[in-house]
Regions:
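Active-site region of the double-stranded beta-helix
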Residues: 273, 299-306, 315-325, 331-333
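Histidine-centered catalytic micro-motifs
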Residues: 49-55, 292-299, 328, 376-379, ...
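Short, conserved beta-strand element in jelly-roll/cupin
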Residues: 303-321, 362, 370, 394-399
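Non-heme Fe(II)-dependent double-stranded beta-helix
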Residues: 181-192, 198-294, 300
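Non-heme Fe(II)/2-oxoglutarate
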Residues: 217-220, 226, 368, 375-440
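A short secondary-structure junction signal
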Residues: 105-107, 162, 290-297, 304, ...
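Metal-dependent phosphohydrolase cores
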Residues: 1-181
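Double-stranded beta-helix
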Residues: 319-380, 400
Length: 440
């Protein structure tokens, strides 16, 4: 089933009552998902909240609980979501949300007291309060704590006319969490060229939160020992913000972007094993900002003995030719056996640059561009009056180690942000500043 068909099926639930409550089945799911978003839950939990009751309608032949929905709807729903291609972490939570109810019926007298008449009746059909052995098994489940959170949203999602995102808000999120979120044609392009442009990976509505978090980081003061702000000095003595690094722990929105299951699954697919975040940066390229010289990333990523990286660029603002969008060399895929002529600063030589056809990759806000560490790339100056902000997150093979903290510790020592620099000390950028216009 396509995501469009799933959304249409959910939309039809607007006329199906949620028994014993003043909401429809659709409204109940939307409210549960909205509560998950407000709680800062991971995307797979948000989708589990949206879809936790699909088992009530996905199998017309299911046994019924005397007008109270399908018997075993949690298992039916989990099987259905797995069958239509959603990632297993979603179906696992959906399959556990009735166990959470049965657990709370034993361990929380107040919870049991507040159950509606309909919920009390369905509890009987669902096996009643857990036995001691069932309690132990459920507590040992890897989804135990998340299932309890899901249950709390389930119980609270019964308000008349509550504020919450509408159904369309979840379209892009659902696509991201499909096992086939990348098509065979896209994988073929990746394998042939080492890069991939995925349009509309995040919706305009979703990008509101990302843009707000980026605005917040942009306005934050320079603080030693925390987020790392780097500047460029162009034709005047005025410093212009060029880049921020090491910000994952300071903006929760970026936690899901960089380490949530959807993007880790995508990066793992492209890297051919589990991916681990190596480093993150925001390139701002404000109006008048300088370009980035042509280079490959691989020569700059040798510090920790890793052999292969993939970078995910999320376009926060639109990227155009006028504001200096990313440009990629159109060439068959390169690897460590392909030697390109470089300058001493590890940028590509004029001869190497002239040997490629450079393709501007214009992007809309919410698009991804992914490229491996051997893809030659560059960008031009921003000659427009609008910014071209973009998130760049680089990943390595998890088997080669988790080096994010060590990377930023070494960079802070060798090439610190302005606020941490000592007067009279000459900082050589080396591998920490290849091809970019950050001031020395």
């Amino acid at each position: 089933m396509s995501i469009t068909k799933l959304l249409k099926s959910l939309e039809n639930l607007s006329e199906l009552a949620y028994v014993g409550e003043p909401v429809s089945q659709l409204e109940h799911g939307l409210q549960a998902a909205g509560l998950a978003i407000k709680a800062g839950a991971a995307e797979h939990m948000v989708l589990a909240a949206l879809l936790h009751d699909v088992g009530h309608w996905c199998n017309p032949e299911a046994l019924q609980m005397e007008g109270l929905g399908a018997l075993g709807h949690e298992s039916l729903g989990a099987e259905y979501l797995a069958a239509i291609g959603l990632q297993p972490e979603i179906s696992a939570l959906v399959g556990a949300h009735v166990d959470a109810k049965r657990f709370l019926a034993v361990t929380n007298a107040e919870y049991t007291r507040k159950l509606s008449a309909a919920s009390s009746k369905t509890l009987e059909y669902q096996g009643g309060p857990m036995s001691g052995l069932e309690l132990s098994r459920f507590k040992a489940s890897p989804v135990f704590r998340d299932a309890l959170r899901l249950r709390a949203w389930d119980e609270a999602a019964k308000e008349y006319k509550a504020e919450r995102p509408d159904l369309e808000y979840y379209r892009a999120m659902l696509v991201r969490h499909c096992r086939d979120s990348v098509s065979n044609a896209q994988l073929d392009h990746w394998n042939r060229f080492g890069w991939l442009h995925i349009k509309n990976w995040y919706s305009a509505d979703e990008m509101v939160a990302v843009t707000s978090a980026t605005d917040d980081l942009q306005e934050r003061p320079e603080v030693a020992g925390k987020w790392m702000k780097y500047f460029e000095v162009a034709g005047s003595d005025t410093r212009t913000l060029c880049r921020i690094e090491n910000f994952l722990q300071y903006e929760p929105v970026y936690g899901e972007l960089l380490q949530g299951s959807a993007n880790l699954n995508l990066l793992s697919l492209l890297i051919n094993e589990r991916a681990a975040l190596f480093k993150e940066k925001l390139n701002f390229k404000l109006p008048g900002g300088q370009g980035f010289s042509a280079h490959q990333d691989a020569p700059a990523f040798t510090t920790f003995g890793q052999r292969f990286h993939v970078t995910m660029m999320l376009s926060i603002d639109h990227g155009t030719k006028d504001n200096g969008c990313l440009e990629i060399a159109r060439t068959p895929r390169l690897d460590d056996s392909d030697s390109l002529e470089m300058n001493e600063d590890l940028t590509l030589s004029d001869n190497a640059v002239a040997g490629f056809h450079w393709e501007p990759i214009e992007t809309a806000s919410g698009d991804l561009v992914l490229f491996d560490s051997y893809v030659p790339h560059r960008s031009a100056p921003n000659l427009s009056n609008v910014s071209r902000r973009a998130l760049y997150a680089t990943y390595n093979k998890a088997s080669e180690g988790d080096f994010r903290q060590r990377y930023f510790s070494q960079k802070r020592g060798a090439f610190p942000p302005d606020v941490e620099r000592e007067n009279g000390v000459a900082y050589a950028a080396g591998v920490f500043n290849v091809g970019n216009p950050v001031s020395l």
